[in-house]
């Protein structure tokens, strides 16, 4: 007689979840950060606000961002003047864009990841889709299933409105799905488009202006599975552990509200300070079981909320400047793409490691950390184990 224990054992994978492939995509429209303030104040009919424009120029100059990609072009914005005003009812116009474009951009990234993985898409058993750009029913997960031609029986999980920490969340969920379902191959997609948050400037809402200086569009996709098929699947990283926590005394530190005017964004406290103050505790809890306490001995993938967060984390932990190289590179080339950022950084790290002939995907090191920071203030901590390049 078969027992429940026997059934459970047969259902579970043997080894840890691994990242098997990564793909990324951006809209074609590239925006130069140095000239963006001119464009932004012109398109929003705000050129008379000279002092505010100077302030925004300084924000952009200090952002450490060279360029960003945006679905919103001058033509689209001219056709949708309500999106350009500071607080005009505009949710319908925004939704009409993102409901179509979020799955479309996700498809581009997913197609690249599936190609690298090298297996037929019929072998994808689960889909995790994450976006903070708009909501709809059936969701972006359903639309992507149709766009890619995945099996109708693919098990879908749709994550809306999570914000910037969710690149860590999707890895945590994909790990559990892959390890608890033998043979599972999880397609994870994060797709973010700033059409929901774009709006004109206001003297009284400077945190909105911070978002206008930092956010960019992008989608990233990964394939996660345990027990890779030898000679067929080439794992890049192992997902060793994953944790989520709400930081103490951080209520209202980062808020987003979906309203008639779109998604409004609020930074109410010292976010870089809160993160740097609590980051060592998260690291210690994650790495104590491995006997690791030297934060320069591991590789780093941190959500680049903005340069101030990275600077304070670096200072607090006495990190060598090269530790956040991949993170800063992605911030500089793409801006803050919310949940997709950490997956872009993962991609950048494994590519650069291979290019430089380093022995592992994690800059030649064995162990690493991936951090997501976002509304709550919520922190996701994922421990990674790199593999041979």
Curated annotation (Swiss-Prot):
InterPro entries, per database record: Chalcone/stilbene_synt_C, Chalcone/stilbene_synt_N, Chalcone/stilbene_synthase_AS, Polyketide_synthase_type-III, Thiolase-like
An annotated GO BP: chalcone biosynthetic process
Catalytic residues, chain numbering: 164, 303, 336
Biological or metabolic pathway of the protein: Secondary metabolite biosynthesis; flavonoid biosynthesis
Pfam families referenced in this protein's UniProt entry, alphabetically: Chal_sti_synt_C, Chal_sti_synt_N
This protein's UniProt keywords: Acyltransferase, Transferase
Family affiliation: Belongs to the thiolase-like superfamily. Chalcone/stilbene synthases family.
Protein name in UniProt: Chalcone synthase
């Amino acid at each position: 007689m078969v027992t429940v224990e026997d059934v459970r054992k047969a259902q579970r994978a043997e080894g840890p979840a691994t990242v098997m492939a990564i793909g990324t995509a951006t809209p074609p429209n590239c925006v130069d950060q140095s000239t963006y303030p001119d464009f932004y104040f012109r398109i929003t009919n705000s050129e008379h606000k000279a002092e505010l424009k100077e302030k925004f120029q300084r924000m952009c100059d200090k952002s450490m961002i060279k360029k960003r990609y945006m679905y919103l072009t001058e033509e689209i914005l001219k056709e949708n003047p309500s999106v350009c005003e500071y607080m005009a009812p505009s949710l319908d116009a925004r939704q009409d864009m993102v409901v179509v474009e979020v799955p479309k951009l996700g498809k581009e990234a997913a197609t690249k990841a599936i190609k690298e993985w090298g297996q037929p898409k019929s072998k994808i058993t689960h889909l995790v889709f994450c976006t903070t750009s708009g909501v709809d029913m059936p969701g972006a997960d359903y639309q992507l299933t149709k766009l890619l031609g995945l099996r109708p029986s693919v098990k879908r999980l749709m994550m809306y409105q999570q914000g910037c920490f969710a690149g860590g969340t999707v890895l945590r969920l994909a790990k559990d799905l892959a390890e608890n379902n033998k043979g599972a191959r999880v397609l994870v997609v994060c797709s973010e488009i700033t059409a929901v948050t774009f709006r004109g400037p206001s003297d009284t809402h400077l945190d909105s202006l911070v978002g206008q200086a930092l956010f960019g569009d992008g989608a990233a996709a990964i394939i996660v599975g345990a027990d890779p098929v030898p000679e067929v699947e080439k794992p890049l990283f192992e997902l060793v552990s994953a944790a989520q926590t709400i930081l103490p005394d951080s209520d209202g530190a980062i808020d987003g509200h979906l309203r008639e005017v779109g998604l409004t964004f609020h930074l109410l406290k010292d976010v870089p300070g809160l993160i740097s103050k609590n980051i060592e505790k998260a690291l210690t809890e994650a790495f104590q079981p491995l006997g690791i306490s030297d934060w320069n001995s591991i590789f780093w993938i941190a959500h680049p909320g903005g340069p101030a967060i990275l600077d304070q984390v670096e200072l607090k932990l006495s990190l060598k400047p090269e530790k956040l190289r991949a993170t800063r590179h992605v911030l500089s080339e793409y801006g803050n793409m919310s949940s997709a950022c950490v997956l872009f950084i993962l991609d950048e790290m494994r590519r650069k490691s291979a290019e430089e002939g380093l022995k592992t995907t994690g800059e030649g090191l064995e162990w690493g950390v991936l951090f997501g920071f976002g509304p709550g203030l919520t922190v996701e901590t994922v421990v990674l184990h790199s593999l041979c390049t």
